[in-house]
Amino acid sequence: ASDVYKRQGNATNLSKGNLRVNSSGRYLEYSDGTPFLYMGDTAWELISRLNDKETELYLENRREKGFTVIQTVILDELDDMDVSSNGEPKLIDGNIDKPAPGYFTHVDKVISLAAAKGLYIALLPTWGDKVDKQWGKGPEIFTPENAYRYGKWLGERYMNAPNLIWIIGGDRSGDGKNFAIWNALATGIKSVDKNHLMTYHPHGEHSSSFWFHNASWLDFNMCQSGHAQQDFAIYQRLLLPDLKKEPHKPCMDGEPRYENIPINFKKENGRFGDDDIRHTLYQSMFSGACGYTYGCNDIWQMFDTGREPKCDADTPWYQSMDKQGAWDLIHFRRLWEKFDFTQGKNQQTIFGNIPLENKNYPVAFGNKDYLLV
């Protein structure tokens, strides 16, 4: 893409104040009342795997493409607790009550590098495998008690960061023993950090609302439509019900199908492409979502030669940053900046009784002044 498409200047204007939910309970805004668009990229392994120079390269690429938020993790899924990009362990002796100073200085730097570009960091304190191992590396290290202490420590450390959004969870449910741990982690952070929004990242084809809609710490809902479904039915199951829940909370798809990931994780099915990005982006936003997160299979894991590929990753992350799907977001952002989405709503009634095909399901959005289809 030519330079004409690139965003000029910082990703956002952090001087507009902390983020909050607007009065409608549907959208996000700065404390000065200016609407905020959550336009996320998925970089789960950013902190663990990229050094300072690589981090700068990645963040600058995302600023140019109009992203406003980078989703990443402190205690990640793929690498051991004693492995990180700066050679420091993440925890001393694997003890959650002993965060390693060197690693957290690196976390600080990533947040600061992003802030300098006006990018928010949507930060997961841990991936879900440290709470509920299942298919991750683990180990399970959390109890409700130490999760609260870790959360409070994080809240004290980052409460004044100008560019932070908290994400609890990490591809896991809130059921069973998990519920008390996630709740304690969130409550620990919020016990000291009153400045930042918080949501929850669930496992595939689920929403944070399934367990935490009424939790005082959950400011907005996040669903994961996941990497198997290919039509609008998944939003009819997840996003549309969330929009109807009381009390109203903003909602969004925080993990739709990734560009270049095998469909349903099977190579013989082919891979999701840029058209899938546009489908999920416009279908969710025109339904009334407050934001959207893009993902690329090679970037979430920061795949490179010499690293074990997950989900059949096949291209180094730095060669994957300019895929068409990533460029598509800046066009939506310009549309969003032209029309006041906070004053619009879904307008499906314009289709009348026309039979609608589910895979290419048309969605309309607007108000008396504009209509987008």
Spans of features found by a protein language model:
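Short, small-residue-biased leader/transition segments that mark boundaries at the very start
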Residues: 1-5
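Low-complexity, Pro/Ser/Thr- and charge-rich linker/hinge segments at domain boundaries
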Residues: 6-30
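Active-site mouth of glycoside hydrolases
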Residues: 24-220, 224-232
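Aromatic- and carboxylate-lined catalytic core of secreted/periplasmic carbohydrate-active enzymes
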Residues: 34, 250, 259-261, 273-373
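Short glycine/serine/threonine/alanine-rich loop segments
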Residues: 67, 119, 249, 289-290
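Helix C-cap/helix->beta junction micro-motif
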Residues: 117, 192, 246-247, 287
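Active-site clefts of carbohydrate-active enzymes
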Residues: 172, 218-220, 239-275
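Charged helix-capping and loop-helix junction motifs
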Residues: 182-183, 235-236, 271-277
